[in-house]
């Protein structure tokens, strides 16, 4: 149905998360309608990113330098580590400009159905880091999915043994949200995470 190069492009686009066959087809046609220079710039950006971006040896965030910009910032509070599953979670927290400590990126969540156990994540490195540094608090900023809950329980069990306070970010209602539209789990978490005013 498609010429071989177009079929290959669609096939490769489909491998991206959240991209199904129809979206891959739309993206491929869009790219081919644009000037050739734009497609080449996109290809060059992909090549540069894959060649120049690695992971920070300390926090495992994506970075072109080692250690990363965040780990090198002198004003960061080294006694607090925020644990996230993926670099995109770190970016979301950084956008708030509220957290002033350091991070640790696990590289995923425990998921036995997909064959991902604690050994496949950067948990050993986290425990070594907490044990070696003067860490007073470990904040678990992990999504409240089944895999996230499993990972949170596993981490809290092993991190607590090392001595620091283990906390978890609160989950609840979004700003501007209506109570009547919130699901039971969200409301329960909001009630659990309430604080004095």
Swiss-Prot record:
Keywords of the record: DNA damage, DNA recombination, DNA repair, Metal-binding, Zinc, Zinc-finger
Toprim domain span: 79-174
Q: Does the keyword Zinc apply?
A: yes
- Which residues form the C4-type zinc fingers? 56-71
- Keyword Zinc listed? The answer is yes
| Matching Pfam families | RecR_C, RecR_HhH, RecR_ZnF, Toprim_4
Can you supply a Gene Ontology BP term from the record?
double-strand break repair
The molecular function terms in GO held by this entry are: DNA binding; zinc ion binding
SUPFAM superfamilies according to UniProt: Recombination protein RecR
Q: Which InterPro entries match?
A: DNA_Rcmb_RecR, Rcmb_RecR, Rcmb_RecR_Znf, TOPRIM_dom, TOPRIM_RecR
The record's annotation in SMART domains points to:
TOPRIM (SM00493)
Q: Known PANTHER family for this protein?
A: RECOMBINATION PROTEIN RECR
State the family named in the UniProt similarity comment for this chain.
Belongs to the RecR family.
Q: What does it do?
A: May play a role in DNA repair. It seems to be involved in an RecBC-independent recombinational process of DNA repair. It may act with RecF and RecO.
What's this protein's name?
Answer: Recombination protein RecR
Which organism is this protein's natural source? Answer: Gloeobacter violaceus (strain ATCC 29082 / PCC 7421)
Gene name of the record: recR
């Amino acid at each position: 149905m498609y010429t071989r190069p177009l079929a290959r492009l669609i096939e490769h686009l489909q491998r991206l998360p959240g991209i199904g066959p129809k979206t891959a087809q739309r993206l491929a046609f869009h790219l081919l309608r644009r000037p050739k220079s734009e497609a080449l710039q996109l290809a060059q950006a992909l090549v540069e990113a894959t060649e120049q971006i690695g992971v920070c040896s300390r926090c495992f965030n994506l970075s072109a330098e080692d250690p990363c910009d965040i780990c090198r910032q002198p004003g960061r509070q080294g006694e607090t580590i925020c644990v996230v599953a993926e670099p995109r979670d770190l970016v979301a927290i950084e956008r708030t400009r509220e957290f002033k400590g350091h991070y640790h990126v696990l590289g995923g969540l425990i998921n036995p159905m997909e064959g991902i156990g604690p050994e496949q994540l950067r948990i050993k490195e986290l425990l070594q880091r907490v044990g070696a540094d003067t860490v007073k608090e470990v904040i678990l900023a992990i999504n409240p999915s089944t895999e996230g809950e499993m990972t949170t329980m596993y981490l809290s069990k092993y991190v607590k043994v090392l001595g620091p306070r283990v906390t978890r970010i609160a989950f609840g209602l979004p700003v501007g949200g209506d109570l009547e539209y919130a699901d039971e789990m969200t409301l329960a978490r909001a009630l659990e995470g309430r604080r004095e005013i």
